[in-house]
Amino acid sequence: MTTIPRKGSSHLPGSLHTCKLKLQEDRRQQEKSVIAQPIFVFEKGEQTFKRPAEDTLYEAAEPECNGFPTKRVRSSSFTFHITDSQSQGVRKNNVFMTSALVQSSVDIKSAEQGPVKHSKHVIRPAILQLPQARSCAKVRKTFGHKALESCKTKEKTNNKISEGNSYLLSENLSRARISVQLSTNQDFLGATSVGCQPNEDKCSFKSCSSNFVFGENMVERVLGTQKLTQPQLENDSYAKEKPFKSIPKFPVNFLSSRTDSIKNTSLIESAAAFSSQPSRKCLLEKIDVITGEETEHNVLKINCKLFIFNKTTQSWIERGRGTLRLNDTASTDCGTLQSRLIMRNQGSLRLILNSKLWAQMKIQRANHKNVRITATDLEDYSIKIFLIQASAQDTAYLYAAIHHRLVALQSFNKQRDVNQAESLSETAQQLNCESCDENEDDFIQVTKNGSDPSSWTHRQSVACS
């Protein structure tokens, strides 16, 4: 009997040797960090316009590594020769070659030739690996049952490592995509384990918060019928001891019905009933505000700033800002008006100016927005210089109103002085007339007595000598 050798049986010992080498490399990579270090290789390009003869050798070497069917690989018209010893097997700039085939050929060359020192560094793109299930299926087709068992042991070790480092891999998923095949497998397992956690948390949250409303049925947990009836009985006994005080009494049936109604109503219904009740408004007593200006008539009211002049520092000091009022008080017996200036500070309504207008009061318009006046200070009741700062229109109205009243006061004082002078002259004349009348009366009395006026004069002269 002749035995027909199975296809690919000649390559089985070599493939097992390469698989063992791959397992050793993977274990070394597991001991290292999860993310592989990038390797930088600098290339020198040489333009060639002909396909090199090495492509035929590469096509013949490909079925020996992974069992892929032989395909003719076309190189681009412009290729670059690479000086790296590891990349001698397959061209990196080959457009029609996948990254997986390039990597497998490089690994086989490195396994056969042993470790080779890098003469230069090459910048390589990210390696996109196939899923573990497909790779295992390909290994089963190419290498047989022994290779499949080694692949399963490799998956078990990957699962153990992924369980130990799941939290680290979940944080670095974006970086681990660039790593080697082991790290990609760990990322896949770590992502599945992490993805299951939010679902478990959601299920536990739903089970905990099943139809629970905060604050609902508080009466069942805090108040009971016995707790309500006992204080009520104590109140009844206290009412019997003091009959003069009226205390409302509720029967026990009323309290039980009330608690039953509270239990039956839900939180939403009780809130709606509470909001539907009329709100209790607190009525405050009205207080009459007395300012002392009730009997006065307001003539002018402006918003302004008040400054006072300090003689020691020769500067203006702001007293405050607020509302300035010019009020006319009741007229006197002579028919004149008494006016005063009142100003209160804005906000606190503190009195900062309260001065009457008098005839000797000085007023001067400094500019179109400022007016200087002399008024009495509330602190020491002395006459000081004040500056009123307001808008141009308000300043004009204030100056005109004060000036008009000062002119009226001055004219009234002049008229009063004239009247006083006239009254003094009249009283003097009356006194002179009375003295003349007295002398005439004395002369008439002497003549009536019958005495000679010549003898009266003689006697008078003798008396004088």
Swiss-Prot record:
Answer whether the UniProt record assigns the keyword 4Fe-4S to this protein. Answer: no
User: What PROSITE patterns does the record tag this protein with?
Assistant: RANBD1
A Gene Ontology term for the protein's cellular component? cytoplasm
| Pfam families from the UniProt entry | Ran_BP1 (PF00638)
Q: GO molecular function: any one?
A: SMAD binding
- How does this protein assemble? Interacts with SMAD1, SMAD5 and SMAD8; the interaction (with SMAD at least) increases when SMAD1 is not phosphorylated and mediates SMAD1 nuclear export.
Protein's UniProt name: Ran-binding protein 3-like
Organism this protein belongs to: Homo sapiens (Human)
Whichever gene encodes this chain, its name is RANBP3L
